[in-house]
Amino acid sequence: MLKTLRKAEYVELVILFFIQAMAASAWTVSLGMVLDAHGLHAIKALAFAATAIAAFISPLIFGAMADRHVPPVRVLRWLALATALTMSLVSTAIKFHCNQWLILALLQLLALANAPLTGISSAIVLARLADSKEFAPIRLMMTLGWMAGCVLVSLLGVDTSALSGYAAATLWVILAAFTFFLPPLEVPKSAENLSWHERLGLDALTLLKNRDHRVIFFTTTLLNIPLSAFYPYAPTNLRNLGFTHASAWMALAQVSEVIAMASLGWLLGNWRLKWIFICGLIFGVLRFAFSAINTKTWLLIGVGLHGASYALVFVTAQIYLDQRVESSWRARAQALLTLMNNGVGYLIGYLGMGWWFAACVRPTGTQWSLFWGGLATIAAMVLIYFLAAYRGTGANSQNQSA
């Protein structure tokens, strides 16, 4: 396993995460508002569900490729370029008011290219660290990059414009160019004599046989169901309450994430993983409960808690897998996490939350307290499941601190 020994290597990993998150947020946070501004509100739920559908297909395939066939850095480069190209096509179709079904088809192609990126980049970074506990400070730069993308969109004044897609596409091209400065990891072992089951990465499903692995996968998946409503609908709620630069205000979510990420290294050294997960899940419940009060102050507090919940649950899950799964399965384990979270969780969430939002709309306006209150209830049920199911035991010495 390669180790991060030089400052130059550390800077490379930091830049990788920063640019990737900046590109992702510039598009993700503004997408819902762009669709609304161009008369495409009717397809919003399906547009976000495209990401979930893609997560069933491409992460495991490309994760297996990065484990066995092609150096992960090269996989990341070509996927970043494919993301930039398809994002430009989507933005052009929206700008010129093309048929909504063509726009949805292009969004699906974009999602297929984009879905594996976080898992692969995380596997690249983790493979170069001597200790997975070092991951949190580097992952912090992804949080700062996400904030930078939100602020960039608002500074450019393109919160509701298809131009936000062109800005994000440019950042993906920059990321692809930057990968040429990353030293490639060791070329994966030969793919000879592999079954199609293994070539498609489906053997990663065997990880679910382990009880604690299964609980972690299921917990993050279930939490993604209410979480999927955050970016499609929180900016709309902000604008309804009078916040004009919603994308910039959404960056408050990353303030608590910065604090949580900065604290995660210490927490991993002093707390059991179980208590870190529980703390993150509690923040998840409070995030929606405070939003349900539906005043400017409480909604902003709810938005702010999003980041702490995300870091303590989802980033800890990535570190958990790196500690508890053999290194030869690293990319596939992260890919399976992407499939479960962004696939199963988000697909149920985007479609279900689209229905739930419609059910909360009245002739007098959206019943935001009812909407967010329902999501707080779901998050509380996820917390109860984790408390009842997680044991924190496993097969190797690293499990003792879980």
Features from the language model and the residues they span:
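Juxtamembrane intracellular "pre-TM" segments in multi-pass secondary transporters
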Residues: 1-7, 182-219
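Helix-loop boundary and gating motifs at the non-cytosolic
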Residues: 2-55, 212-251
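Hydrophobic core of transmembrane alpha-helices in multi-pass small-molecule transporters
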Residues: 18, 86, 99-119, 221, ...
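Helix-to-loop junctions at the C-terminal end of transmembrane segments
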Residues: 57-71, 157, 259-273, 357-358
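C-terminal ends and interior cores of transmembrane alpha-helices
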Residues: 81-97, 282-294
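Multi-pass alpha-helical transporter architecture, strongest
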Residues: 90-94, 172-186, 343, 371-402
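Cytoplasmic helix-loop-helix junction between adjacent transmembrane helices
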Residues: 108-141
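A membrane-interface helix-boundary motif in multi-pass transporters
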Residues: 155-172, 354-379
